[in-house]
């Protein structure tokens, strides 16, 4: 069964769109790189160009040479602009169902 999760983020760098998807695979790759989502959040808040590039590569499922060019593109685009978008993506990884998940009111007995 396929579900569209809350929090898919498109980031445009140097005319190329990177679609970051809130998947368990992305979470695992980011956690492996930063020791957890908190470490990734700290890298974004510290305006780490390489940290932002790693998150983009993990979220977009990039590997090898595709992933290697992302840091330069983040730097060219401006890390502040990129970090704002990545904060939204990381928030979605903490809660992939989104803010409206669940029932508005309790079920009646």
Explain the meaning of each model-derived region:
Residues 1-17, 28, 32-50, 61-109:
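Charged interaction scaffolds used for protein-protein
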Residues 21-22:
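Short linear motifs in exposed loops
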Residues 56-58:
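Intrinsically disordered, low-complexity regions enriched in acidic/Ser/Thr/Pro/Gln residues
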